[in-house]
UniProtKB/Swiss-Prot annotation:
Keyword check for Hydrolase: no
UniProt pathway: Amino-acid biosynthesis; L-tryptophan biosynthesis; L-tryptophan from chorismate: step 5/5
Tree of life domain: Bacteria
Protein name in the entry: Tryptophan synthase beta chain
Lineage: Bacteria, Pseudomonadati, Pseudomonadota, Betaproteobacteria, Burkholderiales
Modified residues (N6-(pyridoxal phosphate)lysine): K92
Family: Belongs to the TrpB family.
Any one annotated GO CC term: cytoplasm
One Gene Ontology MF term: tryptophan synthase activity
Cofactor requirement: pyridoxal 5'-phosphate
PANTHER family given in the database record: TRYPTOPHAN SYNTHASE, TRYPTOPHAN SYNTHASE-RELATED
Pfam family, one: PALP
EC number(s) reported in the record: 4.2.1.20
Region feature (Disordered): 411-434
Source organism per UniProt: Polaromonas naphthalenivorans (strain CJ2)
Length: 434
C-alpha cells in the first residue's frame, strides 16, 4: 500500500504545484486557503455538500458493465463510471457545488469561471442559479463556436458568457482572462476554477471535491466485479480533474494501474496535440508549476484537440507528480481514434459519450485486448456527448435536413448506405492515426 500524503502545507506535490500569483492576488489566495482549511473537515459543511450531491446531483452515479463492448473487443471486462448521468451531464458539478458553498461562507456574491467544453461553465451557472449568485463565464471564442449548445445552456441559467478572442481562443486564453477579472474584482469575486490546476489550494481543493467519484467506486466495483477492485482505472486528462477524482482514492491500491489519456490530436509528433505530460517540460502556468507544452524559449505553444475540454497546454501538478514517481501512466489517443470510440460506444452500448470521455474509452478498447477475460478496466465516463453532436456531425459529413427517416442506415453527406459499409468511426475508410 502506498503511503501517500500530498500536497505539503505550501501546496507542493514534489517539485510541482505551489502558488505563483501576482501580489494583487496574494491576499485572496491566503483568504481562500484559510477558508478551505476551516471548512474542509467541518461536519456541517460536509453534511451540506453530501446532501447536495445526493439530492441535487443525483449521486451516487452508477457503474455499468459494458458487456457487449467487452465481448466484441475481447480480453478484459470494461466497466464505465457513469458521471455522464449527473445533473448537468458531467463530473464538473461535484466541484462547483463545493466551491460555491465556500464562496457563500466567505461572503462572495460574484462568481467567475473559465470553461473549454462548456461543462464547467454550465455546472458553475447551475449552482449560481441555485444559490442566487452572479455568474460570469469566460470561454474562448473558438470553443464558443464548437460548444454552442452549452453556451445557450449557460445563458438560460442566467450566466454572462464572455467570448475570449486572444491567443488560440481556447481554454488557456479563457483562464487568462478569468485571472485578469479576479485581479480587478478581488474583493467581491470568487473564482471557481474547474480543474486540478491553478495556485494552491485549488489543485488540492478540486481533487478533494472530485474524489467522491473514486470513493464511490471503491465500494461499487467489488459488487460488480466478484469482490475485486479493477486491474486498471482509465480516465481522460486535460487539466485532469475527472482523472484525479477517480485516481486519488485508488493511489493506495498499488495493484490497480492508473492510466491517464491525453489528447494526441493529429499525432504526438505532429505538433498538433495537447499532450503536456508526454511532450511538455516543467514550467509555470496559471499559478502552479507543472508540465507545460512550450518552445525552446519557454513560450507556451498552441495546442490542438478535437475535444475542447482537453485542449490545454498544461496539466494539474498532482498528475505531474504521479507521472514522475511512476504511480500513474499517461498515454495518447488521436482525434480519429477518439471519434471512432465515440461512434462505437453509441452503437454498441447505447451511450453517447463526451468527446473528452471518448479518449478514455478508445484507450480502454486497446488495453482490453492485452488483458485476460477475468481482468477488469474501470473507465471514468466523465460526461455525455450532447454538446458534441454538432462537431461529430460536421466531421462525419452528416446532413440532417431534407431527407426521410434513415433509421437503420448509415449516413454520410446526406447519402444513405448500408451499415456494413461503415467502420466503427461512422465514416467510410476512416482509420486511426499513429
Amino acid at each position: 500500500m502506498y503511503d501517500y500524503h500530498q500536497p505539503d502545507l505550501a501546496g507542493h506535490f514534489g517539485i510541482y504545484g505551489g502558488s505563483f500569483v501576482s501580489e494583487t492576488l496574494t491576499h485572496a489566495i491566503n483568504e481562500l486557503k484559510d477558508a478551505y482549511a476551516r471548512y474542509q473537515n467541518d461536519p456541517k459543511f460536509l453534511a451540506e455538500f453530501n446532501y447536495e450531491l445526493k439530492h441535487f446531483v443525483g449521486r451516487p452515479s452508477p457503474i455499468y458493465h459494458a458487456a457487449r463492448m467487452s465481448r466484441e473487443q475481447g480480453g478484459a471486462q470494461i466497466y464505465l463510471k457513469r458521471e455522464d448521468l449527473n445533473h448537468t451531464g458531467a463530473h464538473k458539478i461535484n466541484n462547483t457545488i463545493g466551491q460555491a458553498m465556500l464562496a457563500r461562507r466567505m461572503g462572495k456574491q460574484r462568481i467567475i469561471a473559465e470553461t473549454g467544453a462548456g461543462q464547467h461553465g454550465v455546472a458553475t451557472a447551475t449552482i449560481c442559479a441555485r444559490y442566487g449568485l452572479e455568474c460570469v463565464v469566460y470561454m474562448g471564442s473558438e470553443d464558443v463556436k464548437r460548444q454552442s449548445p452549452n453556451v445557450y445552456r449557460m445563458n438560460l441559467l442566467g450566466a454572462t458568457v464572455v467570448p475570449v478572442e486572444s491567443g488560440s481562443k481556447t481554454l488557456k486564453d479563457a483562464l487568462n482572462e478569468a485571472m485578469r477579472d479576479w485581479v480587478a474584482n478581488v474583493d467581491n469575486t470568487f473564482y471557481i476554477i474547474g480543474t486540478v490546476a491553478g495556485p494552491h489550494p485549488y489543485p488540492m481543493m478540486v481533487r478533494d471535491f472530485q474524489s467522491v467519484i473514486g470513493t464511490e467506486c471503491l465500494s461499487q466495483m467489488p459488487e460488480m466485479n466478484a469482490g475485486r477492485q479493477p486491474d486498471a482505472v482509465v480516465a481522460c486528462v486535460g487539466g485532469g480533474s475527472n482523472a484525479m477524482g477517480i485516481f486519488h482514492p485508488y493511489i493506495a491500491h498499488e495493484n490497480t494501474r492508473l492510466i491517464g489519456v491525453e489528447a494526441a490530436g493529429e499525432g504526438l509528433d505532429s505538433g498538433k496535440h495537447s499532450a503536456s505530460l508526454q511532450r511538455g517540460l516543467p514550467g509555470v502556468l496559471h499559478g502552479n508549476r507543472t508540465y507545460v507544452l512550450q518552445n525552446d524559449d519557454g513560450q507556451v505553444t498552441e495546442t490542438h484537440s478535437i475535444s475542447a475540454g482537453l485542449d490545454y497546454p498544461g496539466v494539474g501538478p498532482e498528475h505531474a507528480y504521479l507521472k514522475d514517481i511512476g504511480r500513474a501512466e499517461y498515454v495518447g489517443i488521436t482525434d480519429t481514434e477518439a471519434l471512432q470510440a465515440f461512434h462505437y460506444l453509441c452503437r454498441t452500448e447505447g451511450i453517447i459519450p463526451a468527446l473528452e470521455s471518448a479518449h478514455a474509452v478508445a484507450y480502454a478498447m486497446k488495453l482490453a485486448k492485452t488483458m485476460r477475460s477475468d481482468q477488469s478496466i474501470l473507465v471514468n465516463l466523465s460526461g455525455r456527448g450532447d454538446k458534441d453532436i454538432g462537431t461529430v456531425a460536421d466531421l462525419s459529413g452528416a446532413d440532417f435536413y431534407d431527407r426521410p427517416s434513415m433509421r437503420g442506415l448509415g449516413v454520410k453527406g446526406g447519402v444513405a448506405t448500408s451499415p456494413e459499409s461503415f467502420d466503427a468511426s461512422g465514416a467510410k475508410g476512416a482509420g486511426s492515426q499513429s
